[in-house]
C-alpha cells in the first residue's frame, strides 16, 4: 500500500489531463481536465496544488513527450517547464518525468474501439492520456 496517492499529468497547451492512483498503487483512474492557456502563462498550478492536497498526493508523474529518436522537442520542453512551475509552487512534491510517447494515440485508439463519439472523445482524451501515463508508471513499480 502506498503512503500517498500518485497523480499522472498529460500537459498540453490548452489542457492538463489528470489521473490518480488508488491507494494500493495498482490502478489509475481519470480524475479531471484543467483548462489552461500556455500562451498567457495561465497554467492552473494553484488548482493543481489544491488537487494534490485534497487527494493526499505524494508523487506527480508528468508525461514527457519525446521524439521517436529519443530527443526532446517543443512539447517536451513545455512539460519540463510545467514541472519547474509546480516545484516552485509546491517544493515538497516528488515529480517523476515519464516517457509518454504514443500515450495520446493509445488513448484515442481505446476510445475509438469503445465507439465513443468524436464530441465525447474531445472531452476525455487528455484525461485518458493521463491514465495511460500513470498506469505505465504504476506497472513499472510492480
UniProtKB/Swiss-Prot annotation:
Primary localization class, coarse: cytoplasm
BP GO terms, sorted: rRNA 5'-end processing
Record GO terms (molecular function): nuclease activity
UniProt cross-references to CDD domains, sorted A to Z: YqgF
Subcellular location: Cytoplasm
TM stretches of this protein: none
Knockout or disruption consequences: Not essential, it can be disrupted.
Cellular component, GO, one term: cytoplasm
Record keywords, A-Z: Cytoplasm, Hydrolase, Nuclease, Ribosome biogenesis
Enzyme Commission code(s) on record: 3.1.-.-
Domain of life of the source: Bacteria
Cytoplasm is among the record's keywords: yes
Family according to the record: Belongs to the YqgF nuclease family.
Function: Could be a nuclease involved in processing of the 5'-end of pre-16S rRNA.
Protein name: Putative pre-16S rRNA nuclease
UniProt source species: Staphylococcus aureus (strain NCTC 8325 / PS 47)
